[in-house]
């Protein structure tokens, strides 16, 4: 397996360093110094599990959750979820699943993929399971304005994919049944709706991640 270079993300919360590194990554992208995802033998898009936080990204734990899908609106409390078993799972919907109890910069978020509502001692958690490439269409515009140059958006897409792939392998949120959360602790996800330019950047770099020296290990 190729070793992935994650130096960019370790300094992610430092805006100045982040901007400087983005310039370097754009040069890398333009030079073609990236590699394809090494584990795509089945050609299947990897799945990622995202822990969704409350409004303003304040907490991982929700006291009450209201969802809307397929013409239904349902509110869940911890007691109601426990009556139904270990968790409530809402399968993926054609028009997505809207979580009315959360607000983001773009308004009430709508999520692709499935939603799981899981009771914990501190409250309810929400896990959104979806394909990695779909996830990236809501990460890239949340992390970088979609008005940026195309190569910058493509570099951001590759970086975001690389980071997400690493988190899937590391399972840092295993106890919460997730790979990442939707905050700056990992990557901001779902704060903005998909934007055409950002989605194109994800599509044009599909499966590409950063590698260290392009060597297998």
Describe each region flagged by the PLM.
Residues 2-217:
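Conserved, single-site charged/polar hotspot
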């Amino acid at each position: 397996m190729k070793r992935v270079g994650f130096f960019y993300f370790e300094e992610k919360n430092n805006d100045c360093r982040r901007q400087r590194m983005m310039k370097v990554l754009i040069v890398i992208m333009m030079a073609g110094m990236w590699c394809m995802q090494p584990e795509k033998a089945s050609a299947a898009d990897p799945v990622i599990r995202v822990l969704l936080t409350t409004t303003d990204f304040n907490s991982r734990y929700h006291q009450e959750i209201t969802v809307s899908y397929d013409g239904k609106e349902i509110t869940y409390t911890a007691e109601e979820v426990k009556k139904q078993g270990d968790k409530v799972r809402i399968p993926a919907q054609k028009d997505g699943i809207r979580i009315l109890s959360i607000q983001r910069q773009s308004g009430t978020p709508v999520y692709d993929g499935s939603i799981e509502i899981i009771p914990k001692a501190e409250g309810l958690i929400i896990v959104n399971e979806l394909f990695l490439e779909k996830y990236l269409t809501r990460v890239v515009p949340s992390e970088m304005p979609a008005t940026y140059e195309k190569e910058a958006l493509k570099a951001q897409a590759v970086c975001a994919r690389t980071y997400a792939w690493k988190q899937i392998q590391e399972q840092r949120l295993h106890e919460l049944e997730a790979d990442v959360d939707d905050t700056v602790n990992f990557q901001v996800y779902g704060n903005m709706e998909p934007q055409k330019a950002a989605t194109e950047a994800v599509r044009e770099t599909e499966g590409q991640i950063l590698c260290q020296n392009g060597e297998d290990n």
